[in-house]
Amino acid sequence: MVVIGEKFPEVEVKTTHGVIKLPDHFTKQGKWFILFSHPADFTPVCTTEFYGMQKRLEEFRKLGVEPIGLSVDQVFAHIKWMEWIKENLGVEIEFPIIADDRGELAEKLGMIPSGATITARAVFIVDDKGIIRAIVYYPAEVGRDWDEILRLVKALKISTENGVALPHKWPNNELIGDKVIIPPASTVEEKKQREEAKAKGEIECYDWWFCYKKLK
């Protein structure tokens, strides 16, 4: 089982787009990727999730992020299900789906709950260095909110690029709105620098350990 901060395991997978090597397939293009598992093809909640992801695909791609699905179904089941979605819902699924029919990758990533034979609704966000940045699990009975995952990706990218943290419900936080949090000072000198920056109007603070600013 892997955890946040670890390198995503190198593995070759069979998908609806052919054999893909992870994480290289995406990282060599300088892209992040979202690997998400679903319990089974031809099930109602999973169908709504794939429809929702496809509808937001361009938003993810504008951020340099590619989705890739996974379940323990065989590839022909994925293909038939994608055809059903296109014929009945009018949406063509453009991203690949992994056919992990032996459950080997799912087991390695901890996607299969104890005592189960199918995957939970797991989400792994992996950056362009192949590092796992976030892991989210939903139970089989509750579908994912792709808008929240999109928010999470945006926040992770901003944090990575600017060395800041993002508050609850960013960019609509009740205390600081769309501003970002400056990491707390860890030395006396840094504390002094925060206080000086506040006095100059460069940042805002509730206290020296809780400072924030508007991104330029």
Swiss-Prot record:
The keyword Cytoplasm applies. Residues 2-158 form the Thioredoxin domain. It is found in: Cytoplasm. Disulfide bonds join 205-211. Its main location: cytoplasm. It catalyses: a hydroperoxide + [thioredoxin]-dithiol = an alcohol + [thioredoxin]-disulfide + H2O. Gene3D superfamilies: Antioxidant, Horf6, Chain A, domain2, Glutaredoxin. The active site is at residue 46. GO terms for biological process: cell redox homeostasis; cellular response to stress; hydrogen peroxide catabolic process; response to oxidative stress. Substrate binds at residue 121. Its EC number is 1.11.1.24. GO terms for cellular component: cytosol. Keywords: Antioxidant, Cytoplasm, Disulfide bond, Oxidoreductase, Peroxidase, Redox-active center. GO terms for molecular function: thioredoxin peroxidase activity. Belongs to the peroxiredoxin family. Prx6 subfamily. Thiol-specific peroxidase that catalyzes the reduction of hydrogen peroxide and organic hydroperoxides to water and alcohols, respectively. Plays a role in cell protection against oxidative stress by detoxifying peroxides. Homodecamer. Pentamer of dimers that assemble into a ring structure. The active site is a conserved redox-active cysteine residue, the peroxidatic cysteine (C(P)), which makes the nucleophilic attack on the peroxide substrate. The peroxide oxidizes the C(P)-SH to cysteine sulfenic acid (C(P)-SOH), which then reacts with another cysteine residue, the resolving cysteine (C(R)), to form a disulfide bridge. The disulfide is subsequently reduced by an appropriate electron donor to complete the catalytic cycle. PANTHER family: ALKYL HYDROPEROXIDE REDUCTASE C, THIOREDOXIN PEROXIDASE. This is Peroxiredoxin. It comes from Pyrococcus abyssi (strain GE5 / Orsay).
